[in-house]
């Protein structure tokens, strides 16, 4: 009698205790722990493009009468992966729910970029244990970047055996098969591919709203910064074909979307893996700017791949926004070398000069890590001086977080946590100071705002973002939601602007 027959006969319940299954085969067959040496060999394998994704007839109706809930941690790529998984769930017949208490399936789409992100997930698993105990039929899964780390999978196997399924970033398209296996088996379903996946087109999506849309243009990263786990969790760089991207953007434009963001772990390396043509992000954006959609952004950039062609195209303006996120990570050339960023302070500043020369009003934001192993006071001061020199509009700032399997995690570190926290406080004070100064310049000006909805703090106030991604709160009619309207700024705060709508609720774009 197989597992399905046992379930149907009532002899086995899907919540029965997991068996002492030997999981070693998964790691020998489809899972390899992060290895810089092994990962750098991966470029020899060709990427295959699949345009024929569809839900198998045997899985249709799998979700009838069932609800799903996905909790997402981390970056925009994860947000978009969640949209894809939601699309697959809906195609299987599931209904979405905003409550874990109502869900028949709960997925945690995880982030591995920092230890704090992982701690949040393990904390959430602890909370969900009681829910699983009270509802044994609940399917609980962990997916995303954390699942690509062998240490994480081992921890789940040992300490959270109530989890039903674990899968990674490369096999999201196999969600129907994994769900079916989870229902039919009393054992934990583990399928984590260390080999980066192929490029799968035609995946269903349930997008979050009808105003702004994410569009993946590439996957993975080949840069291997010494502190970063992403090349291991997301695989090698793989670009979608331009015709598929253009078709998707045109479809979003026809559906009324006002803004799209092109996504990639290293978005401006787009096209470098093409063997049949020379075609980069600048070429793609030069085609996308002709599509009737008001705003086009991209993230995240690596300074190493930000070329003159891209600057030339961005300078054409129009619907290509001059808000550029350009992570510097450190202002010290010595630290940048230890990070394996492959540029120094001077090269970064030269890139900033080129951008500002071509686009004088460009808005630059960045990422900065403080407390990298053995960072000296002088090296940290170089970061502060670079920040003052560039005058970034804002920055995401972090204390260095060791990631197991990365070269930096093996470095000796003589910087006490107390010093790292002090440096972060000093950096954040500078970030706030310059942000407040730049926001003050908006007072009295009229800006175009894409209205996204009601303010989180006041339902009588509308909220939206400018082309340079500044949050604007203002009074206006609900009909303005989803439109781009003019707002006169009356008061500037450190991280937001308050204003009033100019004229009637007439869309300007």
From Swiss-Prot:
Domain MTTase N-terminal: 66-184
Cysteine pairings via disulfide bonds: none
Keywords recorded for this protein, A-Z: 4Fe-4S, Cytoplasm, Iron, Iron-sulfur, Metal-binding, S-adenosyl-L-methionine, Transferase, tRNA processing
Protein name according to UniProt: tRNA-2-methylthio-N(6)-dimethylallyladenosine synthase
GO CC terms of this entry: cytosol
Subcellular location: Cytoplasm
Binding site for [4Fe-4S] cluster 1: 75, 111, 145
Top-rank taxon, per record: Bacteria
Organism expressing this protein natively: Bacillus subtilis (strain 168)
Main location: cytoplasm
Pfam families registered for this protein in UniProt: Radical_SAM, TRAM, UPF0004
Family, per entry: Belongs to the methylthiotransferase family. MiaB subfamily.
A Gene Ontology biological process term: tRNA methylthiolation
Segments for region (Disordered): 1-21
SMART domains, A to Z: Elp3
Name of encoding gene: miaB
Upper lineage: Bacteria, Bacillati, Bacillota, Bacilli, Bacillales
Amino-acid positions noted as binding [4Fe-4S] cluster 2 in the UniProt annotation, renumbered to this chain: 221, 225, 228
Subunit structure: Monomer.
């Amino acid at each position: 009698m197989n597992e399905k027959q046992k379930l149907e006969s009532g002899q086995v319940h899907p919540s029965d205790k997991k068996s002492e299954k030997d999981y070693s085969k998964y790691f020998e067959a489809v899972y390899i722990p992060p290895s810089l040496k092994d990962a750098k060999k991966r470029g020899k394998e060709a990427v295959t493009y699949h345009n024929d994704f569809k839900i198998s007839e045997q899985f249709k109706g799998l979700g009838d009468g069932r609800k799903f809930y996905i909790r997402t941690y981390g970056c925009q790529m994860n947000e978009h992966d969640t949209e894809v998984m939601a699309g697959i769930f809906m195609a299987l017949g599931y209904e979405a729910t905003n409550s874990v208490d109502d869900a028949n399936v709960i997925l945690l789409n995880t982030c591995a970029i920092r230890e704090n992100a992982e701690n949040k997930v393990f904390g959430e698993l602890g909370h969900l244990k009681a829910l699983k105990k009270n509802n044994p039929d609940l399917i609980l899964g962990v997916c995303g970047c954390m699942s690509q780390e062998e240490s994480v999978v081992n921890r789940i196997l040992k300490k959270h055996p109530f989890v039903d399924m674990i899968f990674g970033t490369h096999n999201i398209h196999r969600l129907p098969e994994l769900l079916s296996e989870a229902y039919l088996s009393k054992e934990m379903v583990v399928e984590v591919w260390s080999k980066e996946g192929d490029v799968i087109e035609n995946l269903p999506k349930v997008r979050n709203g009808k105003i702004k849309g994410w569009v993946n243009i590439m996957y993975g990263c080949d840069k291997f910064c010494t502190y970063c786990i992403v090349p291991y969790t997301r695989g090698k760089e793989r670009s979608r074909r331009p015709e598929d991207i253009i078709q998707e953007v045109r479809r979003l434009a026809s559906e009324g979307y006002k803004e799209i963001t092109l996504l990639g772990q290293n978005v401006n390396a787009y096209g470098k893996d093409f063997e049949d043509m020379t075609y980069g992000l600048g070429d793609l954006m030069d085609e996308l700017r002709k599509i009737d959609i008001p705003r086009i952004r991209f993230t995240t950039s690596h300074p190493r791949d930000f070329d003159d062609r891209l600057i030339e195209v961005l300078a054409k303006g129009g619907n290509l926004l001059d808000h550029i996120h350009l992570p510097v990570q450190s202002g010290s050339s010595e630290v940048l070398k230890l990070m394996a960023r492959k540029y120094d302070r001077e090269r970064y500043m030269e890139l900033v000069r080129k951008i500002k020369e071509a686009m004088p009003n460009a808005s630059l934001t960045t990422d900065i890590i403080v407390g990298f192993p053995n960072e000296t006071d002088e090296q940290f001061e170089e970061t502060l001086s670079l920040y003052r020199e560039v005058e970034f509009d804002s920055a995401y700032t972090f204390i260095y977080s060791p990631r197991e399997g990365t070269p930096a995690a093996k470095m000796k570190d003589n910087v006490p946590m107390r010093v790292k926290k002090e440096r972060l406080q000093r950096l954040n004070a500078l970030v706030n100071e310059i942000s407040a100064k730049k926001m003050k310049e908006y007072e009295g000006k009229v800006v175009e705002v894409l209205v996204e909805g009601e303010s989180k703090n006041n339902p009588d106030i509308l909220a939206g973002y400018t082309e340079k991604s500044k949050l604007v709160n203002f009074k206006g009619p609900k009909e303005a939601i989803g439109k781009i309207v003019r707002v006169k700024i009356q008061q500037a705060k450190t991280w937001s602007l308050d204003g009033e709508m100019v004229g009637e609720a007439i869309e300007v774009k």
